[in-house]
């Protein structure tokens, strides 16, 4: 895991740059990157793909957060 890159992905997502954030998340396969990837597909509205990535996290679920901003802030907090 590259914590700096993943933090950058979260910041980009928070700033609304879905594509740039997604490109970073795709480059990593650890549970934090998978969680970011899941949230990005939740933002996109692709429920099936989002749940696919949630299944590859350390226990996070699609239903755990209704507010994606709050979820991204939680990921950011964990990465610090």
Where are the regions that the model predicts?
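Generic helix N-cap/helix-start motif at coil->alpha-helix transitions
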Residues: 1-5, 29-34
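Terminal, low-structured helical/coil segments at or just beyond the last alpha-helical repeat
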Residues: 66-80
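TPR/TPR-like (Sel1-like) alpha-helical repeat modules
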Residues: 29-31, 43-63
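The canonical alpha-helical register within tetratricopeptide repeats
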Residues: 20-23, 27, 56
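Alpha-solenoid helical repeat scaffolds
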Residues: 35-36, 70
């Amino acid at each position: 895991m590259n914590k700096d890159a993943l933090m950058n992905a979260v910041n980009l997502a928070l700033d609304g740059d879905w594509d740039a954030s997604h490109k970073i998340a795709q480059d990593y396969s650890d549970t934090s990157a998978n969680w970011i990837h899941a949230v990005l597909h939740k933002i996109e509205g692709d429920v099936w793909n989002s749940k696919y990535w949630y299944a590859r996290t350390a226990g996070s679920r699609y239903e755990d957060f209704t507010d994606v901003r709050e979820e991204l802030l939680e990921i950011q907090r964990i990465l610090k």
